Amino acid sequence: MRSLLTSTLKTSFTAFLVFVGVFTHAQSGYSFKFNEQELRNKSNLAIEVPDGNYTVKIRLGNADRSTLTTVRAESSRLLLNNIVTQKGEFKTFKFTVNKRDKFITPDETVQLKTRELDKKNWDKYLSLAFDGEQAGVHSIEIKPNKKAITVFLCGNSTVVDQDSEPWAAWGQVIPAFFNEKVSIANYAESGESSNTFLNAKRFEKALTFMKKGDYVFIEFGHNDEKQRGEDKGAYKHFIKSLKVYI
């Protein structure tokens, strides 16, 4: 049996809450999005919010049965893995999720690849997925967090949020190792090299959110070395691009 226990969405200018029950329609300007096929395998909550970091306070457990719950965000970004509660036991966790869309300005966007067009990393929703043979969510509280340290990941397939199992990369797993004071913003995409990442305006989009105290992790190389031609390759184009990042 797979179930997600949520119902009424209460909103304010600073937070919104989801309580025990069943899903309801949007209130106060927030909207839900559900995929019928996905709901057969896991429960999904998608809430339309502006770009930014959001701290999620989630209480797992159930009064009538034991639970086993894994929580992911956006394109399968791991936050909580196989959390067990016994009958009548509840556990509370906090984590911070980075949400973004493809727009840099109203007239300028990140140049996404075709396979990215339907990815949750680039839509207008903050998406959470709850999975497990006995998944149980008692309540969810979501608040904007403008003080969180953001770690921006720039890279290729070894870093990207892989939304199709069994593929995975370290960039989508590392969020599980941080508390709510840190948010991982994974801009990586399969096939990218140091220069194509820049050309697609991925880094330009990230720059619109960077603030003092944030971090940028850059991992490129194996796609750069495949490039051929003057001023290309791991020892030329890569070095040139690296100077741009720095």
Residue spans of the language-model regions?
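Bacterial Sec-dependent N-terminal signal peptides
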Residues: 1-28
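Glycan-recognition and processing domains
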Residues: 27-46
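A short tyrosine-centered beta-strand micro-motif
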Residues: 52-58
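Short, surface-exposed beta-strand/strand-loop-strand elements in extracellular ectodomains
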Residues: 60, 64-80
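Solvent-exposed loop/turn segments at secondary-structure junctions
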Residues: 64, 157-161, 189-196, 222-227
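Short proline/glycine- and polar residue-rich coil/turn motifs
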Residues: 83-91
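Serine-esterase "nucleophile elbow" of acetyl-processing enzymes
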Residues: 128, 132-188, 203-216
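Alpha-helical cap/lid subdomain in secreted, periplasmic
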Residues: 201-246
